[in-house]
Regions:
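Flexible, low-hydrophobicity surface segments
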Residues: 1-157, 179, 267, 274
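Short gly/pro/ser/thr-enriched loop/turn and capping motifs at secondary-structure boundaries
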Residues: 75-79, 245, 281-282
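Cysteine-centered functional microenvironments
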Residues: 106, 240, 277-283
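Alpha-helical support elements that line or immediately flank enzyme active sites
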Residues: 45-74, 110-130, 199-242, 247-268
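Helix-loop-helix junctions that connect adjacent transmembrane helices in secondary transporters/permeases
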Residues: 145-230
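Short beta-strand-initiation
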Residues: 30, 41, 97, 107, ...
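Short Pro/Gly-enriched beta-strand edge/turn motifs at strand-loop
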Residues: 81-84, 174-189, 273-282
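Acidic-residue sensor for enzyme active/binding pockets
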Residues: 20, 195, 257-258, 280
Length: 283
């Protein structure tokens, strides 16, 4: 019988030399933040500071109207639909920009556009939103209690799917050698990769094609979602995932910011970019 230790040189348990590190260590990686296109616009979002609130009014200072966008400007854009073929699944729609109500801290309400990120953030700082704060839910147990606020008013309760697993639980408990009962609570999670979410969108009017560079782990999901939200054929959308500076799962979904960037590129005919900053990521 062959000595198991011999497999460590070229088989299971072997130390495999990494081939991709050299160019990263030399600063030769190509991330979305490295993309520079002529005439590119930058986006900054005004986000909700509250977990649950009605939007009463949005005040824009004079002179920035053409650089500020709210949900009413996106009437041709569909929200991101959460749906499933599972029996009993309750579907929901996430608006690209919050309409009438916000449902979580950090939800984008207003998008501001300028020639650079600093100017876009200056415009965002000048926007004032009047909120009517509503009771919020902070954990799953409270969310299921009767009488607490509904996340989606059309639902009868805050549960999007119920499933049943049949087993003889009482028999298993009665035959167990020991039973441990504990209640555990975990804090909210934050992936904190080196690179945040990021997108560059460019519209080619001659080809009627949208090209999106996204820091995504699932470019095909992004392409399908953009097609549904923007009303474009998938064949007219090209999603490019360049080097991605970490993801850990949170870059595996379609983002409202990606949809807005695609729409804005189509509207203006200019390339647009949004780079998530650390504060946006943490909220």
């Amino acid at each position: 019988m062959k000595d198991p230790k011999s497999y460590r040189s070229n088989g299971i348990g072997a130390s495999v030399k990494r081939l991709e590190d050299d160019r990263y260590l030399r600063g030769r990686g190509k991330f979305v933040g490295d993309i520079r296109l002529p005439g590119m616009l930058e986006i900054a979002f005004v986000r909700s500071p509250l977990a649950h609130a009605n939007i009463k009014n949005i005040h824009k200072p004079e002179g920035v109207e053409e650089s500020v966008f709210i949900c009413e400007d996106l009437i041709s854009v569909s929200g991101i639909k959460a749906d499933s073929g599972l029996p009993g699944f309750k579907s929901s729609v996430q608006p690209i920009l919050a309409s009438k109500k916000v449902r979580h801290v950090g939800e984008p309400v207003v998008a501001c556009v300028a020639k650079n990120r600093a100017a876009a953030e200056d415009i965002a700082d000048s926007i004032h939103i009047e909120f009517e704060e509503l009771p919020a839910i902070h954990d799953m147990k409270t969310a299921m209690d009767a009488g607490n606020p509904l996340i989606h008013e059309s639902w009868d309760k805050n549960c999007f799917l119920e499933t049943n697993v049949e087993t003889n639980f009482d028999e298993a408990i009665s035959s167990a050698s020991s039973i441990v009962k504990r209640t555990f609570q975990t804090a909210r999670q934050c992936m904190a990769p080196m690179e945040g979410r990021a997108v560059v969108a460019q519209w080619d009017n001659q080809l009627s094609q949208l090209t999106v560079h996204s820091a995504t782990q699932m470019p095909h999901i992004v392409r399908t979602g953009l097609s549904e939200c923007l009303g474009l054929e998938e064949g007219k959308i090209r999603v490019v995932a360049p080097d991605v500076g970490g993801g850990f799962g949170y870059k595996g979904i379609l983002l409202a910011e990606e949809v807005f960037a695609g729409w804005l590129a189509m509207k203006t005919g200019r390339p647009v970019r949004w780079l998530e900053d650390r504060r946006e990521h943490l909220t």
